[in-house]
Amino acid sequence: MTSSANQPFLAAIQLFVDGSKQEIEEAVRRTGIKILGRLVDMSPVGQPEIWQVNQTASAYNTAVREHNAALRDDPANLTKAGRLRRGLRVNDSMDIKRPEGYVGGRFKNNWYVGLDSQPTETNDIPDASGQGSNSRGLAVLEVFRVGQVNSIYFTNNLPYAQALENGHSNQAPGGMVGLTALDAAQYFREAMSEVRNGR
């Protein structure tokens, strides 16, 4: 049993512990937000123009654009108004192949955060900004509490996620998760400093 003389001291300790818990919770939330933000930012967005199947078409279209631009460099090809003379411009291109209705950004919008269990869901909504992933993750991280959560998972469950992590995309040749994991401790240090300095 504690004496009443110790109550103020114990209350001060409890206040410190509660304050420290709140700081840690906020630092963990901020760290999670930094990790998720980096994963989303590094996530490639499908660009059919750079797909292997479209390399010939893309190269041809670029050559046509460059040819037309070169024509403009010769003053003999221009009218008095500075426009390209009729009949000189090449009006040709090859179609870029893509699945019907394809819009890039599905992978970027499929990052999920889970507390103590790995998320299993996916969605079919393209979002090249990644705002959907960030919003969902923030909502999960907001409920993080010290002592109630042992693990935080960052997951992208699309079937091609592993291929992208293994460098399948020129936009993210080193993947996303491995590189972000290397910086996780630094993100925590930054977040802890922000919390302690009231930023």
PLM regions: where:
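Short, Lys/Arg-rich flexible segments
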Residues: 1-199
